[in-house]
Structure formats: structure tokens, C-alpha cells
Amino acid sequence: MGRRPQLRLVKALLLLGLNPVSTSLQDQRCENLSLTSNVSGLQCNASVDLIGTCWPRSPAGQLVVRPCPAFFYGVRYNTTNNGYRECLANGSWAARVNYSECQEILNEEKKSKVHYHVAVIINYLGHCISLVALLVAFVLFLRLRSIRCLRNIIHWNLISAFILRNATWFVVQLTVSPEVHQSNVAWCRLVTAAYNYFHVTNFFWMFGEGCYLHTAIVLTYSTDRLRKWMFVCIGWGVPFPIIVAWAIGKLHYDNEKCWFGKRPGVYTDYIYQGPMILVLLINFIFLFNIVRILMTKLRASTTSETIQYRKAVKATLVLLPLLGITYMLFFVNPGEDEVSRVVFIYFNSFLESFQGFFVSVFYCFLNSEVRSAIRKRWRRWQDKHSIRARVARAMSIPTSPTRVSFHSIKQSTAV
């Protein structure tokens, strides 16, 4: 594949030998480009080759580098790669120009498709692992009633929001085909709205985590005064009118392609993206204040409640940047460089798909209260079954030596 562009250019050079591309106008432009160079001694004069590439005035014995042509004989080339030509020691240009690195955009599109398919596999794998981990965490919070305080209820709801988001992601991937995407049927728009709603709830439940910690640590209010319904309204309630407003905007201004993507000049997606960015920034402010208090006032405190707060803060410190980084990446332009684009695609796919896994690990599997409750349950189960086993063994002995001798005595007496 690497030789194909070079062969195409060589064939073109043979054809162009009969009808040179180089003109006096091109030569003049190339000469003007060389005026800025400060070259002394033996040198190669400015020259335009048969492809149309300008080789500026250069010192003898130097390998000169120029970008590949952008468009040649109906084929687009990647201008981030280079062609090479040697200025010989005698001050003349080498007859051969090395265009071996100049690749057709078509080949790069094929490479992009390969990277896209790998990214899709990473996405499916990550969402599967995340969904399994989230479901396990959900069941643990459901079964372990002994740890059901407000702090863990907030964790539980955050995990539920991620489960629903992961589930709707699979619905989108498995049902919205290119044909459905173009037809813009009502049900696919509802699926998109549901996915975006659960996406927003993730951020608002993370905001609930920040509110709880900020209230308990920075404002030093008793958490007994906080109520579950307040956080339910924040996490599940507030995103609903936001998505309704977004859906109305899409319906009137961008009603196409199942409401995925956006048309140039239409900014309806900012109706829900704006609040997400806002709560993300507020959470960063909360975390700054929380860490400041923990580093100064609560460092010496060793109460169990303070220890739990510290662990919750550590989890939030890890998870909030994860959520923030993945979302802010959508606003980053990876540039034209192929390596940058590939790194961007893989990095974004990994973080986006494994978010749920990280949430379940930090808020459930590494939660000391959850682990302690599981150990207690396990010990109770072992004790219960060991007692049953002892009783069962005692009851399952058919005859003991005492019972045998008594039975024998009874028989002999009867005789």
C-alpha cells in the first residue's frame, strides 16, 4: 500500500515530462519564497518540480523537506507528510524527488475506519463491564439495609443513574440503524431524549454528592437536617425540564437524524450541555473548599464519621475529573495529526465507556461500610450453616452405642 502513491506520482511525472507543470509564474513565486532565506556559498537555486512543488534556494549538501502536494491528478494527499529532495554538493538539485511518504487521503480514511471499529469494540467492552459492575453494586446497596444512610443512598442513586445511562446506550447502539437515523422516526427521538436525560442525571447526582459533602464538612451543618427528597429533586427532577426544553428546541430548530448531532449555527444542544458544565464547575469549587477544610481543620479528627467523609472525598476527587475530562474532550479539537486523532479516539472511548465501572468501584466495592457489612453477612451465613450442619449431623446418626445396647436389652427382656 505504501508504494501505491509513489507509483502514481512517478507515472504522473512521466506524463508531465511531455507537458511540464512548471510555468514562469510558479517559478517567480518560488523565487519570491526564496528571498526570505539567507543562504551563502554554493547553493541550489529555487526550482519548481514537475509535480508543482517549490524547492527554495538551499545550501549545497542539504536534504530539503517540503510538504506533500494537497491535490494532484484528481487525488487528495495528506499535506502533514513530506517530500524530500537533495541539494547536491555541486549546487544542483537531485533528479529524483522522494515522495514515498505522500499518502492518499483514501488510504488514511481506510485507516480511520480501522481505528473507528477498534474504538467501537472498546466502547462495547467498556459498557458491558461497567453495566455488570454497576448491577452488582446496585444489588449490594439493595440487600445491605444496615448501611442505608443518606450518604449511601446518594451513592445508590448515582449508580442507578449510570445503570440507566448504560442501558439506554445499548438501546441506541442496537436499534438506531443508519436507515432509522435518516428517517428520524418518533421512537428514535424518544430514545435519544432518554439517553440525554440519564446523561444529565449522572452529572446532577455527582452534584448531589458534592452538595452533601460540602454541607457536612464546609458548612458544618448536621446531615440529619438533610432530607432524601431534596437530593431526589436535584438528581432526578431538575434534569427533566432541561431535557423537555432541549426536546422542544430540537423539534422546532433541528428536527432531523434522531436528534443526534447538530446543524451548523444551531445551538439547541447547549440547553442541556450548559447546565452539565455549570454543575461540573460548581462541584470543582465544592471540592476545593472541602479539601481545604480537610487539610486544615479536620486533619487531627479521627472520628468514624470524619474518616468516612475523607474516603468519600477521595472517591469524588477521582471520579469528578473522570466525568469532567470525558465531557470536556468533546470540546477539544484533536488537530490534523494522525497520531493525535488516534490517541483522542481511544482515550475518549475508554474513559466514556468505563465511567460506570469506576463509579461502582470507588463508591461501592472500595466503600469500607459495604465491605464491613458483607463480611458480617458472610460470618452470619457461616455461623448459621455451621450450626445447621452440627444439628443435622447429630440428628442423622441412625444408631449410637447406647441406643444399640438398650435395644438389645429390650429384646432379651421380651424373650
Swiss-Prot record:
It is a multi-pass membrane protein. It comes from the Eukaryota. GO terms for cellular component: apical part of cell; dendrite; glutamatergic synapse; membrane; multivesicular body; neuron projection; neuronal cell body; plasma membrane. One of its GO terms (molecular function) is G protein-coupled peptide receptor activity. The modification Phosphoserine is found at residue 301. InterPro entries: GPCR_2, GPCR_2-like_7TM, GPCR_2_CRF1_rcpt, GPCR_2_CRF_rcpt, GPCR_2_extracell_dom_sf, GPCR_2_extracellular_dom, GPCR_2_secretin-like, GPCR_2_secretin-like_CS. Residues 99-108 are annotated as: Important for peptide agonist binding. Residues 280-290 are annotated as: Important for antagonist binding. SUPFAM superfamilies: Family A G protein-coupled receptor-like, Hormone receptor domain. Keywords: Cell membrane, Disulfide bond, Endosome, G-protein coupled receptor, Glycoprotein, Membrane, Phosphoprotein, Receptor, Signal, Transducer, Transmembrane, Transmembrane helix. The chain crosses the membrane at residues 112-142, 150-174, 190-218, 226-253, 270-295, 307-331, 339-368. This is Corticotropin-releasing factor receptor 1. The lineage of its organism: Eukaryota, Metazoa, Chordata, Craniata, Vertebrata. The gene is Crhr1.
